[in-house]
């Protein structure tokens, strides 16, 4: 009896095992796997397979499974599913409404280290981070649709991020945190709708399952991502303030890296996409990795480009705390709507570009208009009456910012001087003809000059001085320029020296002090007279120290003889002075006075703060002075300064910007 019962139990178990074996062979799995399954695994896999048939009752469908007649591509069609899985950098999974995994591809083992058999039929909640359980529940829940669908089945798109358990070795796992790996899941929630008999518009729905593709971020097989022409990367702080940008950002957006550093990414994103970026930023801080949706990144001059970013939080190796964010960005399109400005930076950039184009076009038009006059000016160039000047490096930079060598007043800094209006010489070694004016003005004042720099450069000469060629004034200038220098005292004069006009009879009005203050006035340097300083009072009454002159102490016999010869030559030149040096005719009150030719000396001015002695003259110059009987004969007068002519100790230093304007701002 006992033997019969033992034999019966053995036979039953054998039949049961046989049935399980037959059932395992029906599973869509390789025989090498099914032969090693236990009974529980076979039941679990079978129930999951049956649920999958309910979700996809037609399987692969007529297009793949059963062709009408044999063909050369039959083998490829049968293996199409496996080929797609190998091509896809991820794994496919189907989850029921209760969280049970109905299907997952064998490629999950590449990303998670978990086998297909182990995952299929088990709850997905066992393999995701506890903090992501609520999110997974929300993904599997479908709210009542707002409108009734006429279709029996419809789908709701889903895209989310899960931290799934990863048991791979550290060298193959990629980026993991506490044994979990961020997986980007994208797919749809399949819903089946049933119509009720009670009402035509009443219906109920059933959640069939979630079909999704999981991809690891970044791809686990790539440790160093190669950046192509449509890609750039940036490093930012945890609040998305940019710290470093790849130089490729210039090619795709127009921004230089230094334009975006220390600025937040939110300021350069389309306003309609800020919410999506904020949500991705939140997920990034919570889960450590994220792939953003497609968003619009504003370009520099207008419009935007579509971008998708793969961002990762980098942790400190010592403290294991979040340190910064590294993002690899894929630019998907060219710049769209280039004429549309959506930010203040785009507007300012467009305005600056338009102003530059306008200035360039204006300069080109002026060049065309002045070209005939320029040709005429070339034929009237005269030789330089001065010896080659020597400039310092700072003075050279200052000379390049104005109309150099021109006897007219320099234009304001805001007005661009056309290069054609500036005199030039074809034989000059150095042309001081800038094609544009700087957008800022220099600070005016006294600058030390080094006479040993740029000794080989030749300054340009103006084409017209306002008097005929070879006039006595020109000879006088040449004579004065050859006077020897003594000590550290030098002659300085500011451009313009003589105001030029279309005719010698017309006298230009004296420029006001406020306009001359902002003009780019170059300064020249000439040898100083070591014996006497002559000048004309060109300063307002408020500056008595600049209006009177005195005779210097007695000289030695040899120097006195040379000085007497020079005085005789000056008197001879003064008697033959032309119109520009003759005494001016009396004019009506209020009429603008003609600017005299003045050589200003800063010896006295610099003596207050510099190393020069206090006995130097205050200010001296040579002028064809009007008024008095001595002026009628062309003789020069020497004036002695009064006691009131000395400046008080706290008086501001005068700054000479022209022949008739003195600026008192002591900068």
Curated annotation (Swiss-Prot):
Q: Where is this motif: Nuclear localization signal?
A: 367-386
Q: Where is the bHLH domain?
A: 1-53
Q: State what changing residue 368 to A does.
A: No effect on nuclear translocation
Q: Which UniProt keywords apply?
A: Developmental protein, Differentiation, DNA-binding, Neurogenesis, Nucleus, Repeat, Transcription, Transcription regulation
Q: Which InterPro entries does its entry note?
A: bHLH_dom, HLH_DNA-bd_sf, PAC, PAS, PAS-like_dom_sf, PAS_fold, PAS_fold_3, SIM_C
One example GO MF annotation: RNA polymerase II transcription regulatory region sequence-specific DNA binding
Q: CDD domains, per this entry?
A: PAS
Which regions are flagged for Basic residues bias?
Answer: 369-381
Mutating residue 372 to A: what's the consequence? No effect on nuclear translocation
Summarizing the annotation, the consequence of altering residue 373 to A/G is: Reduced nuclear translocation
Compartments where located? Nucleus
Keyword match Acyltransferase: no
The role this protein plays is: Transcription factor that may be a master gene of CNS development in cooperation with Arnt. It may have pleiotropic effects in the tissues expressed during development.
Subunit description: Efficient DNA binding requires dimerization with another bHLH protein. Heterodimer of SIM2 and ARNT.
Protein name, UniProt field: Single-minded homolog 2
Which organism is this entry from?
A: Homo sapiens
